[in-house]
Amino acid sequence: MALCNGDSKPENAGGDLKDGCHHYEGAVVILDAGAQYGKVIDRRVRELFVQSEIFPLETPAFAIKEQGFRAIIISGGPNSVYAEDAPWFDPAIFTIGKPVLGICYGMQMMNKVFGGTVHKKSVREDGVFNISMDNTCSLFRGLQKEEIVLLTHGDSVDKVADGFKVVARSGNIVAGIANESKKLYGVQFHPEVGLTENGKVILKNFLYDIAGCSGNFTVQNRELECIREIKEKVGTSKVLVLLSGGVDSTVCTALLNRALNQDQVIAVHIDNGFMRKRESQSVEEALKKLGIQVKVINAAHSFYNGTTTLPISDEDRTPRKRISKTLNMTTSPEEKRKIIGDTFVKIANEVIGEMSLKPEEVFLAQGTLRPDLIESASLVASGKAELIKTHHNDTELIRKLREEGKVIEPLKDFHKDEVRILGRELDLPEELVSRHPFPGPGLAIRVICAEEPYICKDFPETNNILKIVADFSASVKKPHTLLQRVKACTTEEDQEKLMEITSQHSLNAFLLPIKTVGVQGDCRSYSYVCGISSKDEPDWESLIFLARLIPRMCHNINRVVYIFGPPVKEPPTDVTPTFLTTGVLSTLRQADFEAHNILRESGYAGKISQMPVILTPLHFDRDPLQKQPSCQRSVVIRTFITSDFMTGVPATPGNEIPVEVVLKMVTEIKKIPGISRIMYDLTSKPPGTTEWE
């Protein structure tokens, strides 16, 4: 069989196969095609007591066979199988007699190798969907004929390869194929993530029933492994740990304290000016109770005026650099994160100097988690993952320190829920372990900074599509070319649901002139936000349905919000100039305080994984004839429920959170001077990330 996607085999193909000296009898190899969820597959397999190892997609088939792997799982990825830059792989992996499960991109690879075709279709699927399954197929044994799964793809199988049959469908789209005699299976959805309700059953069927794994691999004691790693790397040196007070950095510090002598650990909390109300004070008090002495540094001024070096442009491949604007004049989310991350390191170096320590003898410790590295496309996590957003603890400067071996990240293979379990094993108090996550850059990435509106050429047409969707029951009576596009992108079931919703409720749907970061098809997207308003009381189930449907039809939208209050008559087309100034931050800080205080008092904080409160530069309810300038801002409440922060869903008012709790938040936030409207984020992940930036 010929080599695929490349004229010759890459020089390093198979070179990362653990030096070729290991034997993995009974284990599963995960070939990494660059999916954001690659490490989640590894984790899910190990949860089922089967050993798994992650190797590059280009690993040759003979190496996999020689190493004794029992089965192969191919991850998803951001590429198209027909793209010129599609990653190379050895097609013989499908013919060495090993059971193969191809996920998303992996399924498309499998189909193409055996003569099938893959096309980029008009319908993009990003979110949770009901799909039909053939539950007589070994992979789906024990499941219902309809299951809820996560789909996130633009390319779809068109012609199914000879010898394969379709075993799952999402409407008219192929969602699963199988050649049972050869034990080759492909699924377009992601069984590894929590949003696929019975994904674990599918993986168990593959591992046990199809591949014949024994399930005798038990996970090592992670705490002891972390402590061993810290001792081995640090020796007698000092470690500077940057403490935010959140669960990640606190567990990291507790591990350092357990592994090293107390005088080796220097715990520093840097108040960057973007903390929540009274945050630094409460952090210091909480950690003192744990016996951890913390040096608190007020560095707000340094951060507000911080800069970093950046490439001349995104297209410039030369090493030439430019100095960024100061943080308080920067609007780019990526540049904000990079400035904040590099300023953290600069201040850490200043602390080292003030304490008369030798920089070459001091390590920097961080509570970096696996999702941080995956979303930053760090090689530590995945060789091919597409950049979603730069994390403040995985900037270019941090990566340089990491290459020099100067960064300690004992939690780099952990997900959030695993860190909480580890924290309990370390006897940390429950109130600290169960805290909602708060990003290191703090409120800085919860302010949507902008000088001008985000309006591209597709703005008017997209707005017209949204009008058709919001008034679908009336639109079907007036044939329009865009109506045909809407119908082409939706199933009959979707259209029936749209008819029902729009005939019962009076809705407006329109674009907001701002952009937020999302993840669509394993790639980063900076896209529009769709706003929905209504004169009726919100029907939350219907709104959640629309939030799933709209990004599927309009690929330039990655987030949908409901706007509280009367119908929006004139959607804003300009923005209030917004930067990271003290006044802007004070407004958001108060809104965040009010919302979280109400959530805590309601007793529902434990039901919600995280609740970012976002300040946007949008001023509603202005009469265009009076030409009133945009001077107010609006707040978004982003409830989020997840087990691993790789995928998740919003809390539906009336289900996971009482409607009256949400309305109380709206009432209290509206009292803050300068607030125009309150919005509720209806978006799952994907297509929207947890944070807006």
Swiss-Prot record:
- Positions where Phosphothreonine occurs in the chain: 318
Instruction: Provide the binding site for XMP.
Output: 337, 522, 610, 685, 691
Cofactors that this protein relies on = Mg(2+)
Sequence positions bearing Phosphoserine: 8, 332
Where does it localize? Cytoplasm, Cytosol
Q: Which sequence positions carry the modification called N6-acetyllysine? A: 9
Its cellular-component GO annotations read: cytosol
Q: Catalytic site residues?
A: 104, 190, 192
Q: Per its UniProt entry, which superkingdom is the organism in?
A: Eukaryota
Sorted alphabetically, which Gene3D superfamilies does this protein's record hold?
3.30.300.10, 3.40.50.880, HUPs
Task: Write out the pathway annotation from the protein's UniProt entry.
Answer: Purine metabolism; GMP biosynthesis; GMP from XMP (L-Gln route): step 1/1
Q: Which reaction does it catalyse?
A: XMP + L-glutamine + ATP + H2O = GMP + L-glutamate + AMP + diphosphate + 2 H(+)
User: Where this protein primarily resides, as one coarse class?
Assistant: cytoplasm
Per UniProt, residues of the GMPS ATP-PPase domain are 217-435
Q: What class of enzyme is it?
A: ligase
* Boundaries of every Glutamine amidotransferase type-1 domain copy: 27-216
Binding locations of ATP = 244-250
Relay the pH-dependence remark from the record: Optimum pH is 7.8-8.0.
Ordered alphabetically, the record's keywords are: Acetylation, ATP-binding, Cytoplasm, Glutamine amidotransferase, GMP biosynthesis, Ligase, Nucleotide-binding, Phosphoprotein, Purine biosynthesis
Question: What Gene Ontology molecular-function terms does this entry list?
Answer: ATP binding; enzyme binding; GMP synthase (glutamine-hydrolyzing) activity; GMP synthase activity
GO biological process: one example: response to xenobiotic stimulus
Please describe what this protein does: Catalyzes the conversion of xanthine monophosphate (XMP) to GMP in the presence of glutamine and ATP through an adenyl-XMP intermediate.
Stored PANTHER family: GMP SYNTHASE [GLUTAMINE-HYDROLYZING], GMP SYNTHASE-RELATED
For this entry, the protein name equals: GMP synthase [glutamine-hydrolyzing]
